[in-house]
Amino acid sequence: MPSKPTKTLPGATDRRIDALLALLSENSTIVISGAQIAKEIGVSRQQVFRWIETLRALGVKVKGHPRAGYHIERAPDILAPQLLARRLRGTAFSKRIHHFFKAESTNTIAMHLGEAGEAHGTVVLAEEQTAGRGRAGRTWLTEKSAGISCTVLVRPPIPPAHAPLLTLVAGLATRDAVADELPSVPDIRWPNDLLVHRRKFCGILTEMHAEPDRLRYAVIGIGINVNQSKMPGEIEDIATSLRIESGKMHSRLEILIRLLRHLDRYYNLYLAEGAAPILRRFAEVSSYFRGKRVRITTPRERFTGVTAGLESSGVLRVVRDDGLGTEAILSGDVAEAD
């Protein structure tokens, strides 16, 4: 059984900063007195200025009014836990949200929380991620306040062999969350990439701790390129962002709220009805589901073939070009064949 939740994590955003940010953001059109701020965030009136200065040091523009109070000049695009929790009520993801302004890897933090017994639905967020992990040991970096680095901890009652479906669930949720932000229809490349114009803007990494017959917990890491104005030269031909594609800035907070709502919906659909509705939806929105010529790279070989749907566990089936039959791809890199 899960133990008591971890209350404070080293490096996590102080709850008073979170409360102050939420208070100012939700009352951005009025001046709030120092006395009210002190009462709301649980500090003395003498300490209010210090916390305002801490917020300013994080890049939040707060204007002071002598003998009147403070107001926020422009609501910042920060993934503040209190703002998220209020908008996520009724979902599994509203109660335990750990926020970091800078972290190495949200997946690593979530794995530690899973081992410590943290409850299903725990969310870990980072404004900047310096050592995020992608599949096959690749690095996924998140530029400060430009992307979304989000990991959720789940404890589904499913066998380990069905864990690939969790990645599909996350991919569908992410696609639904960003579809209206893009001028072109996004695609899902099995199992974990979201593309637009064949360039990647989102990656998903699912990791788990399992016993032979049961999955103890899984962490689903989702990284989205949102407001990057350009990509590094070495990946600019294969990667993109919502801003690059749309030509405008996007609210990371609103995208994340939609993402977690959709994730809650798809996750509950999967638990209630099994794999069938997830596979049907994937078939509707992914060009990689069937009939796509692909190049497969696994630790033991490379080959080309044509996709032939998914098995009930979420594994991809590929008819090989070399005549060796149909291969079930549990893991490996999938790319569109030239």
Residue locations for each model-derived region?
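N-terminal lobe of the biotin/lipoate ligase/transferase fold
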Residues: 2-179, 202, 250
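Short loop/edge segments at beta-strand edges and connector loops
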Residues: 101, 188-190
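Short, ordered beta-strand-loop transition motifs
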Residues: 63-66, 189, 310
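Long, positively charged amphipathic alpha-helical accessory segments at protein N-termini or as interdomain linkers
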Residues: 2-44, 53, 57, 158-164, ...
